[in-house]
């Protein structure tokens, strides 16, 4: 029998036994080291004292690659959402920095909302579906809601900014984060895209010629809605994909939040030393009013100053005038013309007119509660002010809608309705699908109308500053105006269906001829 039968791949049994003994010795050394390490940790936790040896501390604090727990791989729906953020939101952030810092701040808040939603989805795919009305589920959405609220506050604090249309578009589209709480998320994303598109049209109108970044920004922003719909259709068609046999949602959310924080924090190897503590705060400023409750204010206290000195002088009565210095005649300007010529004070003085009549404070006006109610076949939307979210109405063709006494409100009307009225509003916008009879605008300032499908006519009376956006289906809309100014109509007849603005004429020419008055639009030649 050949000798090779007693060997294993070129090694004899003696060598294999020696290697086995060496491996066993190493394992024993590792076991002894681990036992000593655990014992030192227990003693250190009891005594609450740091380790004496800095080298040992650095050695023990370094994580071992062999003992590190295996990180669970994210499912495909999570990696796809990460790719969505990187391909859609990150380019928007970079482009917003080229436009203005306030737009960049708004995009950072929007990105923060998507990052919080990523943490939520990581927990959802590993847990059972919770009760949507539970406090745990509400707490999980709180970081997302905080970003939406901050975005609305940023918009309100920059109403005078020239980039207010950007902030409004982001604020109107931000509530799309709520798709995780509904069973039909795709249609919700579409609704908020339509609400945001009202403001993106204004961006294109104002900056199409002056800022090429604005056109690119609008394209990327609207594309982010479409790409989000594609992602939801593929992974969450009927709502968030939960795991039937998964862990409890609260535990999964805590684990997902912890992992997110660990990922964002610097690694121990890169941080060689803890940063120095912040400097102590400066000493508080001295108090303006120095009041002593122990002793009353005396003349010595009056010399020291403070509120005690003020009360001491007031309590003197008529003696307070004894401290005034007598002015000599040579120092009186009304008796010395030379002083009047050299004085910087005007000799005639400034004759101010009567004070302006104070206006009635707005707080004294009766403020009625907001009303959104269907009475019979008529919707009433009244007394809404500064609404951060759009008011959505699902109406039928036999119903009419009345919007009155509202300020800074966006109303979105879905479906075909009978008639729409906009009365006594300020900075209100209406986005509608179709209307059978038309729309009336009465005593409204700075209004906006966007028609998605068809509208036979628009009647405008005693209104100023209106912008109307018509669709291709509504190019035949008839517009009647009376006692109105600054009305502009935007039609999608440009290249790539871009909107072209047409101002409504305001000046009329009236002439008498052949026994009749003839009226025509007055045009300025040249």
From Swiss-Prot:
Instruction: Name the residue ranges of motif: SH3-binding.
Output: 169-369
Organism superkingdom: Eukaryota
The entry's keywords = Actin-binding, Cytoplasm, Cytoskeleton, Phosphoprotein
- Region Interaction with SH3 domain of ABP1, residue ranges: 354-361
Pfam families, per database record? CAP_C, CAP_N, CAP_N-CM
Q: Bias regions of kind Low complexity — which residues?
A: 262-274, 342-352
Q: What InterPro entries does this protein map onto?
A: Adenylate_cyclase-assoc_CAP, Adenylate_cyclase-assoc_CAP_C, Adenylate_cyclase-assoc_CAP_N, C-CAP_CF_C-like, CAP/MinC_C, CAP_C_sf, CAP_CS_C, CAP_CS_N
Q: Does this UniProt record's set of keywords contain Phosphoprotein? A: yes
Q: Which residues form a coiled coil?
A: none
Q: Which residue ranges does the record annotate as region Dimerization and actin-binding?
A: 370-526
> Which residues does this entry mark as bearing Phosphoserine?
454
The segment annotated Adenyl cyclase-binding runs over 1-168
Instruction: Kindly give the PANTHER family that the UniProt entry links to this protein.
Output: ADENYLYL CYCLASE-ASSOCIATED PROTEIN
Q: Any extra remark in the record?
A: Present with 8760 molecules/cell in log phase SD medium.
State whether it acts alone or in a complex, and with which partners, per the record: Homodimer.
Q: What is this protein called?
A: Adenylyl cyclase-associated protein
Query: What's the source species for this entry?
Result: Saccharomyces cerevisiae (strain ATCC 204508 / S288c) (Baker's yeast)
What would be the name of the gene that encodes this protein?
SRV2
